[in-house]
Amino acid sequence: MQPITTASLTPAQQQAVRVLAQAAEQADGIEALSEQTLLNLDLPEQPGGRGVKHLLVESPSGMDAYAQVDGGSVELVVAPQRRQRGIGGALLDAALTEGRQVWAHGDLPAAQALARSRELRRVRDLWVMTAEPPTDPDEPAASEGLRVRTFTVGRDEDAWVELNALAFAHHPEQGRLTRADLEQREGQPWFDPEVFFLAEDVNTGELLGSLWVKIEGNSGHAVGEIYALGVHPQAQGRGVGTLLTAHAMAAFAARDLARIELYVEGENTPAIRTYRRAGFTRARADVQYARP
């Protein structure tokens, strides 16, 4: 069956993809599509813009499969009841005419087999690390020349986007976030500026770092995430990250969380070592595959 390719989705199609992703998550025990992919469902067609493409496999019974291509990166999901019929392979083949790499969240055996069948190679590991919520974290200590405050909606967007681009200049996803991307996240139910911490120079007011906390779920079952920790390249070594992390841990301790988690590149050995010392362990890896 030939997937339908479109630059935007109707509201009904957007909802059908979300239902499909939820069904796959329930079947597999892991989210099928990333947050950015789900946010992209709502995007209108953008001539000359990001150029997100949607590939759909529909039948009278509903949405059988879905893939998205964004910046050369592919994510896809197949309905649990429609698997083992060649749909995933056909969809991947079509998506890879537009994209270059494909993500496998959790790197499940079926995804590994599909990658092997297309002679794709493993090119990137993104670890998910988790830890028990802190109960008695250290008080954030004063740091010479630095102060920490929280994000102000309507005032800090442009400065944060500039800082983020510098801090993540070599990161293929985080570093390209725009003000529109930030504002889209500000509209999400989980967004809370009170746990969006900014470190700035006490003399100039220049932003030197940020730590964005994301908390989702009901009390007792909620998950706290170190969503994005970035430090200005010229502020490296000043203790900015340590100071911001202390504020995040205090915020986690003040809430009734089931666990805390973060994402880190599998090749970032120094960061992984630091997180392990802080009590984090690897829970899973999301893997990116590409053609040789």
Language-model features and meaning:
Residues M1-D42, A141-G175:
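Short amphipathic alpha-helix that is part of the acyltransferase structural core
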Residues Q36-P47, K53, S61, A67-G72, ...:
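A conserved beta-strand-loop-helix scaffold within acyl/acetyltransferase catalytic domains
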Residues V52, T97-G99, L257:
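Short, high-confidence coil segments that cap the C-terminus of an alpha-helix
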Residues M63, D70-E75, A79-L146, Y289:
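Acyl-donor-binding surface of acyltransferase catalytic domains
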Residues A65, R124-D125, L208-G209, G241, ...:
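A structural microfeature
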Residues V78, L229-V231, V264:
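Hydrophobic adenine-recognition pocket in adenosine-nucleotide-binding enzymes
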Residues Q84-T97, A228-P233, G237-A254, I272-R277:
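Conserved acetyl-CoA-binding loop-helix of GNAT-fold acetyltransferases
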Residues R118-P137, A246-P292:
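Active-site/acyl-donor-binding loops of N-acyltransferases
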